[in-house]
C-alpha cells in the first residue's frame, strides 16, 4: 500500500526506482500468490505507456503463462498495446487468446469480443 501511496502522490517519479520497488514486493516480500500476481499486473500497467514490446511481454509473462485471476486482464493490456502501435495482427491474436481462455474475466471477454467485432471483422 505504501508504494501506491508514493505513486499516487508523485512522491517517487524515477521509473527505475519505482520498478525496483515493484520487484522487491514481487520477489522478496512474503505475500499470497494472487496478491503477487496483482502487483505484477500493476507493474505492467505502470510500464505500459513507456515500455517497449519485449519489456512489456517480460513483465506480463508470469501472468499470461499461468492460470490466475489476472491472465485475461494482462492479455487485454498487451492486445491494446499492440493496437496502439498499429500492430493489428498481434493485437487480434491477444484478443483471441482471451476468448479461448477457460475462465476469462467476463467483462474483459465482452470487451475483447467487442473489439474483435468492431475492428477486426472481415
Feature names for model-found ranges:
Residues 8-14, 19-122:
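Soluble extracytoplasmic domains of inner/organellar membrane proteins
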